[in-house]
Amino acid sequence: MQQSHIRNFSIIAHIDHGKSTLSDRLIQHCGGLTDREMAEQVLDSMDLEKERGITIKAQSVTLNYEARDGETYQLNFIDTPGHVDFTYEVSRSLAACEGALLVVDAGQGVEAQTLANCYTAIEMDMEVVPVLNKIDLPQAEPDRVAEEIEDIVGIDALDAVRCSAKTGIGIEDVLEVIVNKIPPPEGDREAPLKALIIDSWFDNYQGVVSLVRIVEGQLNKKDKIQIMSNGQTHQVDKIGVFTPKPLDTGILRAGEVGFIIAGIKDIQGAPVGDTITLAREPADAMLPGFKKVKPQVYAGIFPISSDDYEDFRDALAKLSLNDASLFYEPESSAALGFGFRIGFLGMLHMEIIQERLEREYDLGLITTAPTVIYEVETTKGETLTVDSPAKLPPVNDIAEIREPMVEANILVPQEYLGNVITLCVEKRGMQTNMTYHGKQVAVTYELPMAEVVLDFFDRLKSTSRGFASLDYNFKRFQTSDMVRVDILINGERVDALAVITHRENSQGRGRELVEKLRELIPRQMFDIAIQAAIGNHVVARSTVKQLRKNVIAKCYGGDVSRKKKLLQKQKEGKKRMKQVGNVELPQDAFLAVLKVGK
């Protein structure tokens, strides 16, 4: 295919604005699959993706489209995830394209994540083409939404294509716009090979399959390739394109998007965003924008029964074959036994991994409260990174703690602005910017990541009745007065219940935890003292009252000293019990930590 007839594009859309349905229609229109094979949401291949209606991994499809001018064009569509946790995957998918369709729901209008991805695309000098979807709905207001796109995003949307992916109206117009508005790829087919890895996943039979965009040069079957970030070399066994089904072509040239299989054994060997080149004539520099993906949120995950530990470890190893951003290391806890400390990109990522472990590998798991990474400077001048409360050094050894700050961009209708500002202030946020776009307001806050990670998203949705949308990215580490709140039960620390929090909130947080635990721990034959402490200073306490038998019920009248003797005996028994008795913590107690502050 000549380069002038290739179009590489992706679709930018908020969750539920109809991206996957639109891509299904495009595939159907170009005859990529027969009607019998046409399942809903062809590109979302994980069950979980279909169920939650979100796209997690990037996928691609190559379609041949006969345009109205009689020419045949090759359209390479790269599907991108839309959720805020997967922004790096989005930026890699966008880097492989020359243009993007900005799909906006004609009923709902522009949302913050769409906006964030759209700005990423504009920064990369991509052509952004607006498309109004769902115009068949009774509540659709295409004219208002077109104005909103112009106000907020700043691109011309008066002649935006209007379509309905569900009913198939306007699909051909969308294809024509792709051909006419999006520029063809540039790139010298004679230059040394440079290919961008858009995504990699693991196939049980063929090893790692990488989705690549050839930027310069060409790649043939049996070529020896080199991965530029780690210098490993492999031989290409298979090369081709997805029409959603894999089709071997034996060659890919500059400007094209396809897959390669080169017998790579683990996904770390082909990291997303890396550059592939030929071993015999390597390119002189990597493609820009590659970065190692860093986990933002850590949580300890433990199997409920310790017999499952081996299965749990194998399950994690299998999951990490397909997910390069998953980081894990063994951890043991006095309360929960052996498990793993796992790093995630964000809360959605954490929920998805946990759900996949429970669903696909049939494991029962306990999760401890998620924490972010803190930088701790000790009095000896060393800098440590701490990802769990247990690793925090003793109070006397800490010179300062720095916590990660994020820049959060929030888009909200004017009438809910007050609620959102109140919420951000409560979460220790600092407002840095505020602009009005028609009825919407865009506010920018600097917030501590620890506050955003826990329940900020849920609370933002509830205070704004679901209208506010959020996008955030890591900004820097900032010195902050953080403390560890320990929970003591009958004077013994329970490591799995400790949390790191800001000193201002520590008393409230401690009190809430203690109250929550008091409701959950069953009563025993002796008093159970639950305390929250910072260092040696107890900030909150509560007692689970003992159950006691009425020992003097059998006495009729008679002398009072007889009753006293029985009560005294009971008291001594209780005292002895308290010294030897252990408190069994129920499963819910560990979940209580996650719910505090909601």
Curated annotation (Swiss-Prot):
Family, per entry: Belongs to the TRAFAC class translation factor GTPase superfamily. Classic translation factor GTPase family. LepA subfamily.
Any single GO BP term: positive regulation of translation
EC assignment: 3.6.5.n1
Organism, scientific name: Alteromonas mediterranea (strain DSM 17117 / CIP 110805 / LMG 28347 / Deep ecotype)
Main location class: membrane
Alphabetized SMART domains for the sequence: EFG_C
Record keywords: Cell inner membrane, Cell membrane, GTP-binding, Hydrolase, Membrane, Nucleotide-binding, Protein biosynthesis
Pfam families: EFG_C, GTP_EFTU, GTP_EFTU_D2, LepA_C
Function summary: Required for accurate and efficient protein synthesis under certain stress conditions. May act as a fidelity factor of the translation reaction, by catalyzing a one-codon backward translocation of tRNAs on improperly translocated ribosomes. Back-translocation proceeds from a post-translocation (POST) complex to a pre-translocation (PRE) complex, thus giving elongation factor G a second chance to translocate the tRNAs correctly. Binds to ribosomes in a GTP-dependent manner.
Protein name listed in UniProt: Elongation factor 4
Molecular function via GO: GTP binding; GTPase activity; guanosine tetraphosphate binding; ribosome binding; translation elongation factor activity
Subcellular location, record wording: Cell inner membrane
Taxonomic superkingdom: Bacteria
Catalytic activity, reaction form: GTP + H2O = GDP + phosphate + H(+)
Binding site for GTP: 16-21, 133-136
GO cellular component: plasma membrane
Source species taxonomy: Bacteria, Pseudomonadati, Pseudomonadota, Gammaproteobacteria, Alteromonadales
Record membrane topology: Peripheral membrane protein
UniProt-listed CDD domains: EF4_II, EF4_III, LepA, lepA_C
Signal peptide residues on this chain, from the entry's feature table: none
tr-type G domain location: 4-186
